Amino acid sequence: MVRIISLLFASIVFFSFIESKSTPYVVVLGIAQDGGAPHAACTKECCIHKWDNPQLHNQVSSIGIVDPLTNEVWIIDATPDFSVQLNTLTMEQKRVFKGVFLTHAHIGHYTGLIHLGREVMGAKEIPVYAMPKMEIFLTNNGPWSQLIELNNIDIKSLKNNTSVSLNDNLSITPFLVPHRDEFSETVGYKIQGPNKSLIFIPDIDKWEKWNINIQDMVHENDFSLLDGTFYDINELPGRDMSKIPHPFIVETFKVLEKVKNKSSVHFIHLNHTNPALNTSSNATKEIRKNGFNVAKRNQKFNL
C-alpha cells in the first residue's frame, strides 16, 4: 500500500513538472517608464549610482508572451530597449518571434519598431497589432511608414474588446483606457491562457476617469500588472503633476483597498524617480505592507 501511494505521488510530481514546462506564461521584460532608469540627463540620487553599473539599469516597461509547446513568442510594446528585450524573449533567436502588440504612441511604447527596419534587422512582414488611430499614425508618419512600405512589418488591425487568437492555447484582448492620446488611442491588454488570465495596463490617467471598475477587473483576473509610474504627488518637485496624470501608487492602495486578491497586483512602468525601483526603500516596504507587489524583470506568470 505504501509503495502504491509512493508511486502515485511520484506520478503526480512528474506530470506536474511536465505541465509546468509546457504551460504558456507572461514574462516581464522591463519595469521602467518610457525613459528607463537611469534617465537621460539625470544626475539625481535616483540615477547617479546606476550610470556606471549596467546591472542596476531598469529597462523600459514591456512584457512577453511565451508558449513553450509551440516555441512561439509575442512582445507587448516595442520600447527603446527593444533589441535587448527581443533577445531575452527569443532566447537568442531560439524561439519564433510572432509579433508585436502596441499599447499607444508614446515614445517608450513603439519607437523600438525602428529595429525592424532595413538599417537593423531588415525584418520580413513581422505582424504589428495596432488600434485604428495607432495604425493611421504609423502609416502616415516616417520612418514608421517606411517599415510598412518595405514590408518589414505587417499591420494587423485591432478592435476594442475584440479578442485575437494567438494559437490554440492563448488569446489576447485590447481594451481602451483614458490617457494623453495626442497621436493614438491607448489600450491595456488581457492575456488569456489555458488556466489563468493576466491584465496589463502600463499607462492610464486616473482610475476614476475610466468607465470600467478596476476593482472588478482585478478580482476577475489572476494577475494584474498596473500603472505604477509615480509613487505619490511629491515625486517631481516643480512639475505640474496634473499635466502628466497617472494613478499614484498610494491612490491605488485606496482604490483596491477592499480587493481580496491584492497580492495578484504588480506595479509596473515606474518613473526613474519612483522610490519603488529601490527594492529596499520605504516605498517598496509600504507597497508590500499594503498587500501589493512591484514587478521584477524576468518575473514569470504562468497562464
Located regions from the model:
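Bacterial Sec-dependent signal peptides at the C-terminal "C-region" and cleavage site
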Residues: I12-T23
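Short internal beta-strands
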Residues: F101, I126-E135, L225, H266-I268
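Cap/insert and terminal regions of metallo-dependent hydrolase folds
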Residues: N195-S197, I204-K300
